[in-house]
C-alpha cells in the first residue's frame, strides 16, 4: 500500500496556472540512482547473476540450513535493490515497457528467493537456535505449507477466479475512461469536470465550483449501469471463491489476513458510527463560516476554498524540507537528520517533476538494504496536497532507513499494509500540524488546520464508510438483496448517512460506489485504511502526551521490520494492547478539540483579523 490514497489527486494544471499568485513555481529534480546501479546495463548483468545464484542454491547439496537461509537472505537484499531501481525507471518513463517488464521479472525472482528461505525455515529442526529471530516468518511458512482440505479445488478456484477478477478491474478502467464529463468554457479556459475536479473545487469563482462539483457526479453517473454490472459480478466471483476455499466470505478472509476478524471490524465501525454527529458538527461549522463570510446559502462546494484574500504559498524545496523536519523534531536528531538528508535538494534523493511528460502519476519510496532511501513523485505541483504527498512518502522512505539501521532481515521488510501505511500517515498529519503551528495570519492558520481536520475525516470517517459499504455490498450479493444500480445507490446512501454525510440533500453522493477504485482493483483492501488511519491519529495524539517514551517505542518498532504479529507491534507502539473502539473515542476527542480551535479562528477571521 505504498501508493497513498488521498481525497485529492495531482492538481497540477490549476496550480501552475495560478503560480504567479504565489510567486514561486515548483521545482524539478532527478534523483541520482547510481547508488543502486551504475546504469541499466549494470542492473541487467547483476540480475542475470542473481538468477544463476538462486538456481545454484536451489540445487546445491550439503549446505547447512542456517547457511542456506543466510544465502537466501543476502539474495533477497540484492533483489530488493533491483526492485527499487526498476520501479524508479518504470515510473520515470511510463511509455517504455521494458523497465516494467523487467520489474515483473524481478518480482517473480524475489518471490522465488523468499519461498526458498521459507522452505529452509520449515525444514529446520524445531530447536534450531538460528531460527529464533525468524519465529514469526517460520510460523507463516508452516501455515502456508499446510495442505488444504482439497488442494485440487483450491488450485482450480484460483485458476478461474484470478483472471476473472483481473478482467473486471480492467473493464472498470475502460468504462470510466469513456465517462461523459461536462466541459466548461470560462474566461478563455477549458475545464473538464472529471480531469479538473480538484482544480475546480479550489477555484475562487463560486459558480465554477458548483458546476465542477455537479459535473463530476454527472460524469460518474453516465457510466452507472455498466459499473454496477462490473461491481456486482466481481463481488459474486470473489465471494464465491473465498467460500469454496473455506475462508468464509471474502471480507472475512480479508480481515483475517490483517490479523483481525469480522466481530472486531464491526465493533470498530460501530464506534465510528456513534461519532457521526461529530462529523456533521464539523461540516456545519464550515458551512456557517462560509455564510458569515458572505456566501449566500452555502453548499459543500463552498467549503473547499481558503478564506477570501488568502492565497496559500508554494513552498520552495528547502522550505518543504525544513517544515517536514521541524514537524518530526520529537522523534530526535537522528530521525530528523535522516529526513533532512532525504529531502535536501542538494543530495539528489528526490525525483520530482512539474510537468507529467511520460512520467507515471504515482508516488512511492525507493528503498533497499545497503542503499540510500529516495522517493519518487510523478508530478509535484507545489500545492499543499502535493507537498503532503511528499511528506507521506518520506515517512515510508524513513521506515526503510530505520529498518536498515535496525538490521531488519530483508525477508521481513514487508508486512501488514495497514501498519506500514500508519507510519506514513503519521508523518503527513505532523506535516499539516507544523504548517498550522508556524502560520501567523489567522486565515493561514485556519487553512492549514482545516487541512489537518479534513485528513482526520478521511482517515476515520471516509475509511469507515468505505469498509462498511464494501462489507454491505458483499453481504447484499450473498443474500440476493442487491442486483441493480438502484440497489447500490440506496445502500450507499444508507451507509453515508450512518457516518455523518447528507445524501438526502446531496443525492449525487449515492453514486459514490462508482468511484471507489480499490473495490474493483483490490477487493477488500479498503478496510486497511481504516486501521492505518486510526493508528496514525493515535500516534499523533500520543507523541504529544509523553514524547520521550513515545520516541523510544516508535523508533524501536520502526527499526525491527515485521518480525511479529501486527497487533503485537501496535501494543508496543501504544504501550498497551489495542482496544480499537477505545482508540476511536480517543481519536475523536482530539478531532473535536482541533475543531474547537478552528471555530475560534473562524471567529477572529469573521471579525476582520488577518484581512
Predicted feature locations:
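Sec/Tat signal peptide C-region and signal peptidase I cleavage site
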Residues: 22-26
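Active-site recognition of the HExxH zinc-binding catalytic motif
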Residues: 246, 381-401, 424-425, 532
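Short pre-active-site segment immediately N-terminal to the catalytic Zn-binding motif
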Residues: 312-316, 370, 374-390
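Post-HExxH zinc-binding segment in Zn-dependent metallohydrolases
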Residues: 414-444, 452-458, 532
Amino acid at each position: 500500500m505504498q501508493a497513498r490514497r488521498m481525497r485529492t489527486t495531482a492538481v497540477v494544471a490549476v496550480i501552475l496556472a495560478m503560480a504567479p499568485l504565489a510567486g514561486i513555481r515548483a521545482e524539478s529534480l532527478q534523483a541520482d540512482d547510481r547508488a543502486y546501479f551504475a546504469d541499466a546495463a549494470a542492473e541487467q548483468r547483476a540480475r542475470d547473476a542473481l538468477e544463476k545464484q538462486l538456481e545454484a542454491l536451489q540445487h546445491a547439496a550439503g549446505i547447512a540450513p542456517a547457511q542456506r537461509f543466510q544465502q537466501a537472505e543476502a539474495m533477497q537484499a540484492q533483489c530488493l535493490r533491483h526492485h527499487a531501481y526498476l520501479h524508479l525507471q518504470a515510473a520515470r518513463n511510463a511509455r517504455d515497457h521494458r523497465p516494467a517488464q523487467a520489474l515483473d521479472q524481478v518480482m517473480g525472482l524475489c518471490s522465488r528467493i523468499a519461498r526458498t528461505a521459507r522452505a529452509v525455515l520449515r525444514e529446520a529442526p524445531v530447536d534450531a537456535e538460528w531460527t529464533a529471530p525468524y519465529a514469526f516468518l517460520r510460523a507463516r511458512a508452516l501455515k502456508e505449507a499446510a495442505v488444504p482440505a482439497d488442494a485440487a479445488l483450491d488450485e482450480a478456484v484460483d485458476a478461474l477466479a484470478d483472471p476473472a477478477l483481473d478482467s473486471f478491474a480492467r473493464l472498470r478502467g475502460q468504462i470510466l475512461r469513456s465517462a461523459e464529463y461536462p466541459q466548461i468554457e470560462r474566461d478563455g479556459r477549458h475545464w473538464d469536470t472529471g480531469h479538473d475536479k480538484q482544480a475546480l473545487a479550489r477555484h475562487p469563482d463560486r459558480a465554477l465550483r458548483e458546476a465542477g462539483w455537479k459535473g463530476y457526479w454527472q460524469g460518474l453517473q453516465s457510466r452507472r449501469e455498466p459499473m454496477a454490472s462490473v461491481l456486482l459480478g466481481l463481488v459474486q466471483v470473489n465471494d464465491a471463491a473465498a467460500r469454496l476455499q473455506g475462508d468464509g466470505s471474502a471480507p472475512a478472509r480479508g480481515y483475517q489476513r490483517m490479523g483481525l476478524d469480522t466481530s472486531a471490524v464491526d465493533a470498530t465501525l460501530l464506534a465510528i458510527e456513534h461519532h457521526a454527529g461529530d462529523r456533521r458538527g464539523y461540516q456545519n461549522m464550515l458551512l456557517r463560516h462560509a455564510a458569515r463570510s458572505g456566501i449566500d446559502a452555502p453548499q459543500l462546494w463552498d467549503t473547499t476554498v481558503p478564506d477570501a484574500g488568502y492565497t496559500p504559498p508554494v513552498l520552495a524545496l528547502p522550505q518543504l524540507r525544513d517544515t517536514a523536519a521541524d514537524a518530526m523534531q520529537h522523534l530526535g536528531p537522528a530521525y530528523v537528520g535522516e529526513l533532512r538528508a532525504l529531502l535536501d535538494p542538494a543530495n539528489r534523493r528526490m525525483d520530482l517533476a512539474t510537468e507529467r511528460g511520460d512520467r507515471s502519476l504515482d508516488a512511492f519510496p525507493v528503498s533497499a538494504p545497503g542503499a540510500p532511501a529516495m522517493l519518487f513523485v510523478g508530478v509535484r505541483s507545489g500545492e499543499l496536497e502535493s507537498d503532503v504527498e511528499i511528506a507521506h512518502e518520506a515517512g515510508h522512505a524513513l521506515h526503510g532507513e530505520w529498518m536498515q539501521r535496525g538490521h531488519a532481515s530483508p525477508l521481513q521488510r514487508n508486512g501488514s499494509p495497514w501498519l506500514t501505511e500508519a507510519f506514513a500517515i503519521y508523518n503527513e498529519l505532523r506535516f499539516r500540524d507544523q504548517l498550522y503551528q508556524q502560520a501567523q495570519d489567522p486565515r493561514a492558520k485556519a487553512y492549514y488546520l482545516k487541512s489537518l481536520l479534513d485528513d482526520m475525516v478521511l482517515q476515520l470517517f471516509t475509511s469507515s464508510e468505505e469498509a462498511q459499504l464494501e462489507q454491505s455490498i458483499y453481504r447484499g450479493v450473498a443474500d440476493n438483496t442487491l442486483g441493480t444500480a438502484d440497489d447500490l445507490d440506496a445502500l450507499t446512501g444508507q451507509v453515508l448517512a450512518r457516518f455523518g454525510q447528507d445524501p438526502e440533500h446531496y443525492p449525487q453522493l449515492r453514486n459514490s460506489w462508482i468511484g471507489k477504485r480499490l473495490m474493483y482493483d483490490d477487493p477488500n483492501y479498503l478496510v486497511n485504511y481504516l486501521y492505518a488511519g486510526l493508528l496514525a491519529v493515535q500516534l499523533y495524539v500520543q507523541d504529544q502526551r509523553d514524547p520521550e517514551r513515545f520516541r523510544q517505542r516508535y523508533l524501536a518498532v520502526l527499526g525491527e521490520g515485521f518480525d511479529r504479529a501486527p497487533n503485537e507491534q501496535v501494543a508496543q507502539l501504544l504501550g498497551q494492547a489495542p482496544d480499537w473502539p477505545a482508540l476511536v473515542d480517543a481519536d475523536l476527542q482530539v478531532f473535536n478539540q482541533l475543531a474547537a480551535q478552528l471555530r475560534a479562528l473562524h471567529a477572529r477571521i469573521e471579525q476582520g483579523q488577518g484581512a
